[in-house]
UniProtKB/Swiss-Prot annotation:
Main location per the UniProt record: membrane
Residues covalently joined to lipid (GPI-anchor amidated asparagine): 219
Protein name from the UniProt record: Predicted GPI-anchored protein 33
Membrane topology per record: Lipid-anchor; GPI-anchor
Key words of the record: Cell membrane, Glycoprotein, GPI-anchor, Lipoprotein, Membrane, Signal
GO cellular component terms, semicolon-separated: plasma membrane; side of membrane
Signal peptide start and end residues: 1-16
The organism of origin for this protein: Candida albicans (strain SC5314 / ATCC MYA-2876)
Length: 246
């Protein structure tokens, strides 16, 4: 009996202890409205802040709108549009150039060494090369005097070493080419056979004994004939060289 009473007392004490904080929490969330002068001051401060913010925002928005629409709107917009268009065009041009453009070969502007190399890389006969020079030298190169000696063969066109081709710009500066086909070198191929004269032969036959005087006379006649031929050839070469200005 005593135990039951004691247990009831303990339970009652615990329930009473839990009820006290609940009451304290209820008292903590209770708000009190300021009265009198404090309430008026709080209302005034709130109103002043709201009015200041509204006035400032409205003035800034009005100034920005006036500046954009009436003063700088059209002028600024046009300048920006032009700038963007120009920039796009420049970017496109830069992007389109991806590699260097190869310049077409023009024999009319080549020196003899370059022409010799070029002739080994193309397969043109004389007529084709003449036509190429006439159509790729600004229309001023003459097809009849190109200054190139071409020998047709299975391997294509080849140039002789004895000819030179020079291209010079015309006085007007229009890129016209003048071809100089002057021959700079002459090659003479001669074959010479020493034959005894008829008089030397008859003397040699008559004097079969082989005397030294007859042999000397025959040799002298042959040498005289040979010297005459050489002198004649030298005179011809000198005359031709003087005519050509060599």
């Amino acid at each position: 009996m005593r135990g039951i009473i004691l247990l009831s007392f303990v339970l009652t004490s615990c329930l009473a202890a839990d009820a006290v904080p609940a009451a304290a929490d209820a008292a903590a969330v209770t708000t009190t409205t300021p009265a009198g002068a404090a309430a008026a001051a709080a209302t005034t401060a709130t109103t002043a802040k709201a009015n200041t913010a509204a006035t400032t925002n409205t003035a800034a928005a009005a100034a920005a709108a006036a500046d954009t629409l009436t003063t700088k709107g059209t002028t600024t917009g046009t300048a920006k549009t032009t700038g963007v268009t120009t920039g796009t065009a420049k970017t496109t041009a830069t992007t389109a150039v991806t590699s260097d453009t190869a310049v077409a070969a023009n024999p009319a502007t080549m020196n003899p060494s370059e022409l010799s190399i070029y002739s080994l890389t193309v397969t043109m006969n004389q007529a084709q090369l003449q036509n190429f020079l006439a159509t790729h030298s600004s229309g001023a190169a003459t097809a009849g005097a190109t200054g190139t000696s071409v020998a047709s063969g299975a391997s294509g066109a080849s140039l002789e070493d004895s000819t030179t081709t020079t291209a010079a710009a015309a006085a007007g500066g229009n890129g016209a080419a003048t071809i100089d086909d002057t021959t700079k070198g002459l090659t003479f191929v001669t074959s010479r056979t020493l034959k005894p004269s008829s008089s030397a032969t008859s003397q040699g036959s008559a004097q079969a004994s082989g005397s030294g005087s007859n042999a000397s006379q025959a040799n002298a006649a042959g040498v005289y004939s040979t010297n005459s031929v050489l002198v004649f050839v030298s005179i011809c070469i000198g005359f031709i060289g003087g005519s050509l200005g060599i």
